[in-house]
Amino acid sequence: VNNELSDADRFFALVAAAQAGDIRLTSIQAGLLVAAELGIARDSRAFARKLGIAHSLVLRELNDLAAREGVLEIVKRDPRTMRVHYTLPPASAS
């Protein structure tokens, strides 16, 4: 029996864990956070393409997430392509 998780299995396990930690997160929002943390995708189009999700859905979820204080930061918006670059905020020194 192979005990190693595939990259996809690991990603979805982390998404589920993120949702368990914050019940307000949708699966797409949790995916955006995990993708940013793992360096899988740091812009909306890359995330949409890699997961096979419509870019418009990703943009809606990304904007909702960015509206929450301290969860995700919008770095740049490209008005021509609608691509939104994002990052996780720096970890607080608590």
Show the residue positions of the predicted features:
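Short loop/turn and capping residues at structural boundaries
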Residues: 46-47, 59, 76-77
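Short, structured secondary-structure boundary patches
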Residues: 3-5, 12, 62, 77-82
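Short, cationic-aromatic polyanion-contact patches
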Residues: 18-26, 43, 73-94
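Short amphipathic alpha-helical interaction segments
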Residues: 53-68
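Short amphipathic alpha-helical interface segments
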Residues: 25-40, 45, 49
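Short alpha-helical segments that sit at the start of domains
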Residues: 3-31
